[in-house]
Design a protein with these regions (language model features):
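Short acidic/polar hinge/loop motifs at secondary-structure boundaries
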Residues: 62, 134-135, 141-145, 172-203, ...
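Short strand-turn segments of transmembrane beta-barrel domains in outer membranes
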Residues: 203-206, 218-252, 264-266, 270-278, ...
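Acidic/polar loop-and-plug regions of large Gram-negative outer-membrane beta-barrel proteins
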Residues: 299-355, 381-470, 534-552, 702-705
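Surface-exposed extracellular loop regions of Gram-negative outer-membrane beta-barrel proteins
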Residues: 312, 316-321, 539-549, 592-603, ...
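Outer-membrane beta-barrel signature, preferentially recognizing the C-terminal barrel domain
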Residues: 331-356, 612-621, 625, 633, ...
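Signature of Gram-negative outer-membrane beta-barrel scaffolds
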Residues: 468, 472, 493-631, 656, ...
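Gram-negative outer-membrane beta-barrel transporters
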Residues: 693-695, 716-821, 919-923
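C-terminal beta-signal and adjacent terminal beta-strands/loops
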Residues: 696-697, 741-742, 810-827, 853-924
Length: 924
């Protein structure tokens, strides 16, 4: 027996670097295409415990297994994990027939995605004495729940902001270098070609990068990975868009080595049937990909994708406004013009991405190197109303609300009669409830003006705009490069490493969008004109081009470029031992940022034009972790990491629209994270329980607002912010019977500020620091996510390829985003203590239903239907977010000074009531 085990160990070692075929038939194939699945990992537990990387067949290895009962787990990137039980008798073949792996379903919940069917699942394990069926998905049950079920409440995994998660496309980082936020919308609608994904949580090793404290997700769009197919899709919904049409074609890898793939999608909705009025949607999406297999070791691919989109935006408002209109889904951005609804806030973007990739894999499959060059370009604009020397056009402006005359007014001047009049107007007059577009046009057309410069020279005569629509642009140009290598020098050792570089230039400027019946805009700094009326130079937006008269399509107001670059080198080593997988990793990242001004401002002639100083950061990351296999079904896992992370451009520079000043002594964030997990992988039960702790220090935050007490637009820079993220999460799938599966997920967190950070306040029209102190946040809760979330669901899988499911969900302990102004010494001294306490949003409960059906018309031709109904109980009173306004109402004290009186009301948004999504797909 010892001799046999020795022979087996040697054979497994050989197999781990690519075992030759003995039968000519691959052991593991794709369930749809029938092609061999590359890089399949198998974990063997029984009398012999071993992990190995299969070649295309390993029957000769499995035939050498000693007598006994074994658990075999097969996994491959982009596929569901398959776990089987094998009873091996002495001196007999394994009896293991060809296995089919099923590609991951998009989303992982069977709701918005297509049901994938394997026709012969029931026959895969013929010849085995103890057959166990396929586990439903290799995706983590908790991540599946948090990615879809919890998203209705804007759940953020472990309380992390988007900047602590990393989104990649073919190995290229796609998080915005200016803000840190992810960029899913760049390929919105391209569901069919973005399904292949590699996901890692909490620094777990992946081939494409070092990892981050949150979730790393790499989307792969390699054309040769798509099975040969045509795919037609139609979707209908009452969410943001009403209809979606899509067509996808993939050739598969042809005999001549070429692979082609293409996809086009159309998403449309006029806002009439969307859940919130004014949320119209008009979007195209496209993808083109070609790949050539140069030889057995090298392939080259070129892809291009984009998603030109135009959509109406809804904004949060106060509960007073919702109550006045009788709906928690009121949109303050809209009003009627010519009998049609018009939205003042519109997002328009089209940022195509072109990528050239080279793939190398040696004949032994022990070395893989992927290299990608990427270029991103295009336009991204966000429209907004602008006005000067005219009444505020926003319907929910605080002076137009009944509360302005009562609780928001000086106690000595409250007017209940005026409040009653405004309440009645809100309920009866649509021109009060919504933006009065006709009135804006009327005002502009009546404003015949002659504009003169300081010397009396006439600049323009005509209808000067008092109201207008401006488009705020953030147009990015980014070149990026990344390479990663995966090397298997030994059967027990796997080394991954790589390098990447990104250089981003983002043009930030305002553009005249719609003059609303006027002829021109006089481009001056309106706040400077108010504050320095006697000095015309101060109000100049650009001293190099003074007294500009601008019209539709012209740049005005501000114009600068944010320049950022980052390069990183990283390496991981993973050790595959008999019952232990362990890894260590290290990374070094260098980041640089500077501002390039294209205007010489009258207020800041010396530090607004040209290049600023370059601010640089050098950051280190280290990580380690281990997974211990108790037996073939139960595992213990731990991960620990320390990471430094540079601040983003938007949090580094103070008022970059006007000058190149940045925060004093900027620091990188310091992130420490540790977690411990128990994982179970039984044929009938799959899941994990994790306890985690993360401490983030030296975070920086920048914000701007109108300070009523100083009657000026001001900037708040908060430095040294520390947060603590402590909690536990669990997710399980239980196969109750061959046709019934239960799933459950639970997140319990305590996400709090760990210190009282410092702040400085500056006035936008000067470099003067008007206030400097600390903010009392320690022990208060981090906002933006439910800190308690739970779901319990059942799914029935019928023998005729349909499934039906229900999920019951609970969300609690969600807090509004806190204003720092209230919690300073000044705020705590002047304001009532009740305003200092953080506001907790209402807890809530929702129920979701979903169903799917797949009909095989002929071999290789499928018609699939999906229907999802969310919040079937129509709970319309569950807030999913909110923020305290930064402005504070002031009153005049007896000594004539302005005294803080009470904060403006919190603005809230709500979970939609009952919504549906229907999807049908024809694949052939």
């Amino acid at each position: 027996m010892n001799k046999l085990i020795t022979v087996l160990a040697c054979t497994l070692t050989f197999a781990s670097v690519g075992l030759g075929q003995t039968t000519g038939e691959p052991l593991v194939i794709d369930s749809q295409s029938g092609k061999p699945v590359a890089k399949v990992h198998v974990s063997i537990y029984g009398p012999v415990a071993k992990k190995m990387l299969l070649g295309q067949d390993a029957r000769s290895v499995l035939a050498l297994l000693p007598k006994g009962r074994y658990t075999l787990t097969f996994s491959a990137e982009g596929y569901e994990t398959k776990q089987i039980e094998l009873v091996k008798q002495e001196n007999e073949a394994s009896g293991l027939k060809q296995l089919k792996l099923v590609a991951l379903r998009e989303g992982g919940n069977g709701r918005y995605d297509d049901l994938i069917v394997s026709e012969e699942d029931g026959n895969e394990a013929a010849g085995m004495q103890d057959r166990v069926t396929l586990l439903t998905s290799s995706r983590d049950p908790f991540l599946s729940a948090s990615g879809y079920v919890f998203s209705t409440a804007r759940f953020r995994n472990r309380g992390y902001d988007s900047q602590y998660n990393e989104q990649m496309l073919n190995g290229i980082g796609m998080n915005d270098l200016n803000s840190g936020y992810s960029a899913w919308s760049l390929w919105g609608g391209l569901n069919d070609v973005t399904r292949q994904q590699e996901t890692s949580q909490s620094f777990e090793p992946i081939v494409s990068g070092f990892g981050v404290v949150g979730v790393t997700n790499n989307v792969t769009t390699r054309p040769s990975m798509f099975g040969a197919q045509h795919r037609l899709t139609y979707s209908n919904s009452n969410l943001t868009y009403s209809n979606r049409f899509a067509y996808t074609y993939a050739s598969g890898e042809r005999k001549d080595g070429w692979s082609f793939a293409a996809s086009v999608a159309r998403r449309i909705g006029n806002g009439q049937y969307s859940y919130v009025r004014g949320q119209y949607y008009d979007a195209w999406s496209y993808f083109l990909g070609v790949e050539k297999k140069l030889d057995e070791m090298n392939s080259l691919s070129l892809i291009a994708l984009g998603a030109p989109t135009r959509r109406g935006v809804a904004s949060a408002t106060t509960q007073e406004v919702y109550d006045l209109v009788g709906s928690n889904f009121y949109n303050p951005n809209i009003g009627r013009q010519g009998g049609k609804w018009r939205n003042a806030r519109e997002r328009r973007n089209h940022e195509p991405i072109v990528q050239l990739s080279h793939y190398f894999s040696n004949l032994e499959k022990t070395l893989n190197i992927n290299t990608t060059f990427s270029y991103r370009f295009g336009k991204n604009a966000y429209s907004s109303l602008n006005w000067y020397n005219a009444p505020d056009p926003r319907a929910d402006y605080y002076r137009y609300l009944p509360s302005y005359f009562t609780r928001m007014a000086d106690p000595n001047s409250q007017d209940g009669d005026a409040a009653a009049i405004y309440e009645e107007l809100w309920k009866s007059d649509p021109n009060v409830r919504y933006i009065n577009w006709d009135r804006l046009y009327e005002v502009n057309r009546g404003n015949l003006t002659t504009v003169k410069d300081a010397s009396g020279r006439t600049l323009a005569t005509g209808r000067k705009a008092l109201y207008m629509i401006e488009d705020r642009h953030t147009d990015q140009r980014e070149f990026a490069w990344a390479t990663s290598a995966n090397w298997l020098p030994k059967s027990w050792l796997e080394i991954t490493g790589g390098a990447n570089f990104r250089h981003n230039r983002t043009a930030n400027y305002a553009e005249v969008g719609d003059l609303l019946g006027a002829d021109f805009v006089y481009d001056i700094d309106k706040f400077a004109e108010r504050d320095f009326g006697g000095d015309a130079t101060k109000s100049q937006v650009d001293l190099l081009h003074p007294d500009r008269i601008v019209q539709k399509g012209d740049r005005f107001s501000y114009d600068y470029t944010a320049q950022s670059y980052r390069y990183q080198v990283w390496a991981n080593a993973t050790y595959h031992l008999t019952r232990l997988d362990a890894y260590t990793g290290i990374s070094y990242t260098h980041t640089g940022m500077q501002r390039e001004g294209h205007q010489k401002r009258g207020l800041f002639p010396d530090n607004s034009y040209g290049l600023s100083d370059r601010v640089k950061f050098n950051d280190l990351g280290v990580k380690a972790g281990a997974t211990y296999e108790l037996n073939g079904h139960h595992y213990l896992q731990t991960n620990v990491a320390y990471l430094e992370q540079a601040p983003t451009f938007q949090n580094l520079f103070i008022s970059p629209r006007t000058r190149d000043s940045y925060i004093e002594a900027p620091k990188s964030e310091k992130i420490f994270s540790a977690e411990a997990s128990y994982l179970v992988r039984l044929p009938w039960l799959r899941g994990r329980v994790t306890a985690f702790y993360t401490h983030i220090a030296d975070h920086t935050r920048s914000m701007s607002f109108y300070d009523d007490s100083r009657a000026s637009f001001s900037n708040y820079i908060i430095t040294g912010i520390a947060t603590r993220h402590l909690g536990a999460e669990a997710g399980f799938e239980v196969k109750i019977s061959p046709t019934l599966t239960a799933n459950a997920a639970l997140a319990l967190g305590q996400y709090q500020y760990a210190n009282n950070p410092s702040y400085i306040q500056s006035i936008d029209n000067s470099n003067e620091i008007v206030d400097r102190d600390r903010i009392y946040w320690k022990g208060l809760n981090v906002s933006g996510t439910p800190q308690t979330a739970a779901t319990l669901g059942l799914t029935y899988y019928s023998p005729w390829y349909a499934n039906f499911g229900i999920n019951a969900n609970y969300f609690g302990r969600n807090f509004v985003s806190m204003s720092p102004v209230i919690r300073t010494d000044r705020g705590r001294t002047s304001l009532d203590y009740n305003y200092i306490l953080p506001e907790q949003l209402r807890d809530g409960f929702t129920v979701d239903l979903f169903a799917s059906y797949s009909w095989r018309i002929t071999y290789g031709t499928y018609l699939r239907f999906n229907l999802s109904v969310s919040n079937v109980l129509n709970n319309r009173s569950l807030p999913n977010g909110g923020y305290e306004q930064l402005r504070i109402r002031t009153i005049r004290a007896t000594d004539g000074t302005q005294q803080l009186y009470r904060p403006f009301d919190t603005k809230l948004s709500y979970v939609y009531g009952t919504t549906f999504f229907f999807n049908t797909t024809l694949q052939f």
